[in-house]
């Protein structure tokens, strides 16, 4: 027995076949310029084949805001995932402190890339008795800066 296939059913199947590839997870890329919820700006260069990258960071927040300088960062990410985890270190050029960030690069439901991070900042102290107050902990959410084309 042969059944006639409805043109509507064929149209539905064709539509699904064309739309389904676009529903797959979009890859999140660290490379580019980002700003965070505090107004800091980070630029990440190309990620090499080993997952390593470098860049710069200019913070919007500091104990002495008049001394803020562009500071280098160095990091690594897992390359295989569409939404990779990563970590990087910032060597602050204007203070005796270092920060480390860990996070994950996500593509949200609206298609925008977001870096969700947690950080530790180690301040230099003159005496071991001050060690208890030398490490700060926090979080930042970074979003990709708009480009001229957007």
Curated annotation (Swiss-Prot):
Gene3D superfamilies, sorted: Avidin-like (2.40.128.30)
Family the UniProt entry places it in: Belongs to the avidin/streptavidin family.
Signal peptide range in chain numbering: 1-24
InterPro entries cross-referenced by the UniProt entry: Avidin, Avidin-like_CS, Avidin-like_sf, Avidin/str, Avidin/Streptavidin-rel
GO cellular component: extracellular region
GO molecular function (one): biotin binding
UniProt PTM comment: Glycosylated.
Sugar attachment sites: 54, 93, 141
Organism phylogeny: Eukaryota, Metazoa, Chordata, Craniata, Vertebrata
Protein task: Forms a strong non-covalent specific complex with biotin.
Keyword Disulfide bond attributed: yes
Record domain Avidin-like: where: 26-147
Key words of the record: Biotin, Disulfide bond, Glycoprotein, Secreted, Signal
Annotated S-S bridges: 28-105
Organism superkingdom: Eukaryota
Name of the protein this chain belongs to: Avidin-related protein 6
Positions of biotin binding: 36, 40, 57, 59, 63, 95, 99, 140
A Pfam family the protein falls into: Avidin
SUBUNIT field: Homotetramer.
Localization in the cell: Secreted
């Amino acid at each position: 027995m042969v059944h006639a296939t409805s043109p509507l059913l064929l149209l539905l199947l064709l539509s699904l076949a064309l739309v389904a590839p676009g529903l797959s997870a979009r890859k999140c890329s660290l490379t580019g310029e980002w700003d965070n919820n505090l107004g800091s700006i980070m630029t990440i260069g190309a990620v090499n084949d080993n997952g390593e990258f470098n860049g710069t960071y200019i913070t919007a927040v500091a104990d002495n805001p008049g001394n803020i300088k562009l500071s280098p960062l160095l990091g690594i990410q897992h390359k295989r995932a569409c939404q990779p985890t990563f970590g990087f270190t910032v060597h602050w050029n204007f203070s005796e402190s270092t920060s480390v960030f860990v996070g994950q690069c996500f593509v949200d439901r609206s298609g925008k890339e977001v870096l969700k991070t947690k950080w530790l900042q180690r301040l230099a102290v003159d005496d071991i008795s001050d060690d208890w107050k030398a490490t700060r902990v926090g979080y930042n959410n970074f979003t990709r800066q708009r480009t001229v084309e957007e």
